[in-house]
Each structure stands twice: as structure tokens, then as C-alpha cells.
């Protein structure tokens, strides 16, 4: 244990940093959990979530597809799956956490969760010093952002 951070949390941060170093190999795609993106995989994932993807035009779809092809595609919980070695969705992760707390009280390696006021769901990993790592939207990969102001509703330890 480093200070009051459990060893598994230290390991989660180390794994997240490793993934971040290789972030160009990853692409965000809603519903993806670590598949290698081929045309078939892309179309299957796109077809599985018509209500989510209807916001994109045909031209935007083509741009997103070109960005994803050949990469490993993940969404936010897919990123956490790679970090933890578990397989869950964002809500299941936060519901399985101990030490549920407010985002300002999370510790390094804890999860952060939001529903964006009921408009969706998102999960990320507190990596310390006021930052978190996540995979959050199309045409992007694994990224690091500031915790404050993101709209996190709660956090917890897995």
C-alpha cells in the first residue's frame, strides 16, 4: 500500500498509463469493449445502437469509421475493463464499488461516474493530482482531463 492507496489501485493506474502511452492504437466507439475494428465489427456495433448513432450524418459516420478501422475500439467502460481485467458496464462498476463518495473525495485509482443529469452514463479513473483518464467520444482515444468541472456525480473503489 502506498500511503492510503491500495496496491490494486496503484496497479490500475499503472495499467491505465500503459494504455495511454499506446493510445494511438485505441479509438472510442460507443458499445465497444476491446474488439479489433474491422468493417464488419464497426457496422455491427453501429447497428446495435441506432438511437445513439442517429445523431451522426453519413459523412460523419464515414469519418468515425476511418478513424476506428484497424484500432482496438472501446467505450468508457471498455477502457475500465482493460484497466481492471473485469468485464462490466459503467453502472455495474459503480454499483459494485465500496467507499462510494463524492468526486472530490476519491482516491487515486478510484472510479468516477456520472449520468450527465440523466442524459447518459460515463465512467473514468481518478489518476491523482486532480486528473482522470477515460475514453469518452467518437474521433478520440484515451485521454486525460481535469476532474473538476466535468460533472462527476460520485466515485468509488473497486
Regions found by a protein language model. Give the residues of each.
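Aromatic- and glycine-rich peptidoglycan recognition patches
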Residues: 1-27, 33, 89-103, 115-158
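N-terminal capping segments
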Residues: 1-77, 81-86, 117, 133-135
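Structural motif
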Residues: 109-110
Amino acid at each position: 500500500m502506498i500511503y492510503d492507496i491500495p496496491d490494486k489501485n496503484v496497479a490500475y493506474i499503472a495499467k491505465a498509463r500503459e494504455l495511454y502511452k499506446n493510445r494511438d492504437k485505441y479509438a472510442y466507439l460507443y458499445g465497444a469493449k476491446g474488439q479489433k475494428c474491422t468493417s464488419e465489427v464497426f457496422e455491427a456495433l453501429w447497428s446495435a445502437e441506432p438511437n445513439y448513432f442517429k445523431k451522426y450524418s453519413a459523412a460523419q459516420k464515414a469519418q468515425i469509421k476511418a478513424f476506428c478501422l484497424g484500432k482496438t475500439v472501446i467505450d468508457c467502460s471498455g477502457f475500465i475493463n482493460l484497466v481492471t481485467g473485469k468485464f462490466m458496464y459503467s453502472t455495474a462498476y459503480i454499483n459494485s464499488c465500496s467507499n462510494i463518495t463524492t468526486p472530490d473525495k476519491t482516491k487515486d485509482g478510484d472510479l468516477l461516474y456520472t449520468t450527465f443529469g440523466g442524459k447518459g452514463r460515463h465512467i473514468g479513473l481518478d489518476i491523482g493530482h486532480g486528473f482522470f483518464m477515460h475514453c469518452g467520444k467518437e474521433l478520440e482515444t484515451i485521454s486525460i482531463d481535469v476532474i473538476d468541472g466535468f460533472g462527476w456525480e460520485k466515485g468509488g473503489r473497486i
